Curated annotation (Swiss-Prot):
Protein known as: Ribonuclease H
Pfam families for the chain: RNase_H
Keyword Endoplasmic reticulum found: no
Oligomeric and partner information: Monomer.
Primary location recorded for the protein, binned into one broad class: cytoplasm
GO molecular function: magnesium ion binding; nucleic acid binding; RNA-DNA hybrid ribonuclease activity
Residues bound to Mg(2+) 2: 10, 134
Species assigned in the record: Pectobacterium atrosepticum (strain SCRI 1043 / ATCC BAA-672) (Erwinia carotovora subsp. atroseptica)
Described purpose of this protein according to its UniProt entry: Endonuclease that specifically degrades the RNA of RNA-DNA hybrids.
Domain of life: Bacteria
Compartments where located: Cytoplasm
Length: 154
């Protein structure tokens, strides 16, 4: 039987673009693991994506996952938009390159071995795990140590 894992994620950016960070909490039975990292120059959407990617890439076995995010961009992108992006060789409906394609490809790879149910939660609405992820993300953004090598200024 596959492990039942809950994942909560959030991304933060001070400026957008600017210093950013992500926070994620993984829960399996009574075990909890918190993840966070800060980047010197990035965007809020990249950090929302990185939160989900980091959490999923941490798992070493196939799992049944409920992943909660306050990012409609991430939830809609991975459950809906990505199918047509892939059919169109990672182009949008108006034939422009998909933004953050490096992270979308990485997220697509990260979910393949798992069964993932994506849930949206309203941000800054008192959801305890989302608030905790927000705190982790903001703290990481306030003290960034990494370079977001995939970030491309527009």
């Amino acid at each position: 039987m596959r492990k039942q894992v809950e994942i909560f994620t959030d991304g933060s950016c001070l400026g957008n673009p600017g210093p950013g960070g992500y926070g994620a909490v993984l829960r399996y039975k009574q075990h909890e693991k918190a993840l966070s990292a800060g980047y010197r120059l990035t965007t809020n959407n990249r950090m929302e994506l990185m939160a989900a990617i980091a959490a999923l890439e941490t798992l070493t076995t196939d799992c049944d996952i409920v992943l909660s995010t306050d990012s409609q961009y991430v939830r809609q992108g991975i459950t809906s938009w990505i199918h047509n992006w892939k059919k169109r060789s990672w182009k949008t409906a108006d034939k422009k390159p998909v933004k953050n394609v490096d992270l979308w490809k990485r997220l697509d790879t990260a979910i393949q071995r798992h069964s993932v149910r994506w849930e949206w939660v309203k941000g800054h609405a008192g959801h305890p795990e989302n608030e905790r992820c927000d705190e982790l993300a903001r703290a990481a953004a306030s003290a960034p140590t990494l370079d977001d090598t995939g970030y491309q200024a527009e």
